Regions:
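A short, internal acetyl-CoA/4′-phosphopantetheine-binding micro-motif in the GNAT/acyltransferase core
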Residues: 81-91, 120-123, 247-257
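Conserved hydrophobic beta-strand within the GNAT/NAT acetyltransferase core sheet
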Residues: 81, 115-117, 247, 281-284
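A conserved beta-strand-loop-helix scaffold within acyl/acetyltransferase catalytic domains
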Residues: 26-45, 67, 71-79, 197-252
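Intrinsically disordered, low-complexity terminal tails and inter-domain linkers enriched
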Residues: 49-68, 163-167
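A structural microfeature
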Residues: 71, 149-152, 222-223, 301
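Short amphipathic alpha-helix that is part of the acyltransferase structural core
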Residues: 1-35, 46, 68-69, 151, ...
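Acyl-donor-binding surface of acyltransferase catalytic domains
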Residues: 101-174, 306-308
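Conserved acetyl-CoA-binding loop-helix of GNAT-fold acetyltransferases
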Residues: 92-109, 249-252, 258-271, 275, ...
Length: 312
């Protein structure tokens, strides 16, 4: 018989050192630990080696407990598994499978009907399973997860950034203006998001980013995006370097598409971030690689996306 493991609830505060240790051991060579990533882990389960003994609190047994804790699965009650990590010394011994099964069951108890890998809840570390973790991709595929598409992150060095020549001309000829949202416009912008891009409403409600607003000739909102930087903008700063920024939730209303509005907004946001002192700018979770490369961004990371029904 193989070694036994018990599963216990994750304590996000007390288990933070455990998360950091497992991350560094299993992922650190490819993904240097983003400290902000650990802040996103609020619910989950821990695998402990050996079935004996009940769980203890802080005290003399902490060192022994750390030696026994070999894996963690994080869950977001809204319906995602943001992270599953197992000590390399205990991989291929059933720990990951046990954690995945327990995490899926826990999400079913929370009332989730479908579960996504990576994103799908209120926040995420990665949109999906990183392409540069091929062992993780194969782990989930071997357990029946079907990856149906791939998304991409892109980056650009904004120091000295110059928008492509003529990028705003078509939008200008169509009478489109692009400005940073002022406070009194907020209700109108939120109504636009709710009607046009409802999946993004939560990101706009956070109030942690600036909003760029495109308006048509009649003054109606035609497009929006979020931009933030250079301070505290992204959990990927350990990889991107200091003074990183982000652009996200780039959306244009259907009647305004094809007029260069999206391109003009991204270029303008890039200029504003450049002028604010942003170095690397990160654009995450998109399938529109050609759109962003034409604006000076280059592919950075790819993620495989999967979703399946939660257990009843």
């Amino acid at each position: 018989m193989g070694e036994s493991f018990r599963i216990r609830p994750l304590d996000p505060e007390r288990d933070r050192p455990l998360l950091g240790r497992l991350w560094e051991a299993a992922l650190g060579s490819v993904w240097p630990l983003p400290p902000g990533a650990l802040d996103l882990v609020k619910e989950g389960l821990v695998a402990e080696r050996g079935a004996g003994g009940r769980h203890r609190g802080s005290g003399p047994g902490d060192a022994d407990r750390a030696d026994r804790e070999v894996g963690v699965v994080a869950v977001d009650p809204a319906g995602s598994i943001p992270l599953l990590v197992v000590d390399p010394a205990y991989q291929r011994r059933g720990v990951g499978t046990r954690l995945l099964e327990a995490g899926m069951a826990r999400l079913g108890q929370f009332g989730a009907t479908t579960v996504a890998l990576g994103s799908g809840g209120s926040d995420y570390i990665w949109p999906g399973v990183p392409d540069n973790l091929p062992g993780a991709v194969e782990f989930f595929r071997a357990r029946g997860w079907g990856f149906d598409h791939t998304v991409i992150d892109l980056v650009a060095d904004l120091r000295g950034y110059e928008a492509p020549a003529g990028v705003g001309e078509r939008a200008g000829r169509a009478g489109v203006s692009i400005e940073v949202m002022a406070g009194p416009e907020r209700a109108e912008v939120m109504a636009f998001e709710a009607a046009t891009f409802p999946d993004w409403v939560g990101w706009f409600e956070r109030l942690d980013s600036s909003v760029l607003v495109a308006r048509d000739r009649a003054g109606a909102v035609a497009g929006t995006l979020l931009f933030r930087g250079p301070l505290g903008a992204t959990i990927y700063e350990p990889l991107l370097g200091p003074d990183a920024g982000t652009i996200g939730c780039v959306g244009v209303a259907a009647p305004a598409r094809g007029a260069g509005v999206g391109s003009a907004m991204v270029a303008r946001a890039s200029e504003l971030l450049r002028d604010a002192g942003t170095r690397a700018c990160h654009i995450g979770w998109t399938r529109r690689e050609r759109f962003y490369t034409r604006l000076g961004y280059a592919p950075w990371r790819r993620y495989h996306m999967a979703r399946r029904m939660a257990p009843g």
